[in-house]
Amino acid sequence: MSPFAVVLLAFSMSVDAFAVSVGRGAALGRPRYSEALRSGAVFGVVEAITPVIGWVAGVAASSFVQAVDHWLAFGLLAAVGLHMLYAAVWKKADAKPVGRSFTVLMATAIGTSLDAMAVGVSLAFLNVNIVVVATAIGLATFLMSSGGMLIGRLIGEHFGRIAEAVAGIALFGLGLSILIEHLTA
């Protein structure tokens, strides 16, 4: 795999994390820079690990991974999205935003990275250095997620609760689209 292909793959795998991070940054209103870096690190590490898991599983587990990844992604993203929507509509003004919970951050990172596991399975059939590819995916996702949080910060300063509701709907929609895509394929 050429260096250009590795970079293209890495940034392609980070798009979901970027979109979710923009929503999280907006929902938090004014996330600190340390929160953006922490979010980027969590998304980056999870996004780097999942293709390695898929690569290791290879052919033996490909049918299992493909059979359940869409259900796992839908369940995680739908739960987090509905929880954010609920919090945006019914939380008290001084309540802590849902997105600051590490559990929510981790569930969202896992939900957006399950497709990377399937990519990892396909990489098992190619002559690639999985460490290089996984590192590139992790770094790209770190940059995109951290940047997404900071972009979302600008939006959230003006639209806090609305942004949290939209982010919740977007997460649910992302999970639903993953589920529909796999069920109709």
UniProtKB/Swiss-Prot annotation:
Its main location: membrane. One of its GO terms (cellular component) is plasma membrane. InterPro entries: Mntp/YtaF, Put_MntP. It is a multi-pass membrane protein. The chain crosses the membrane at residues 3-23, 41-61, 70-90, 101-121, 123-143, 165-185. One of its GO terms (molecular function) is manganese ion transmembrane transporter activity. Pfam families: Mntp (PF02659). Keywords: Cell inner membrane, Cell membrane, Ion transport, Manganese, Membrane, Transmembrane, Transmembrane helix, Transport. It is found in: Cell inner membrane. Belongs to the MntP (TC 9.B.29) family. Probably functions as a manganese efflux pump. This is Putative manganese efflux pump MntP.
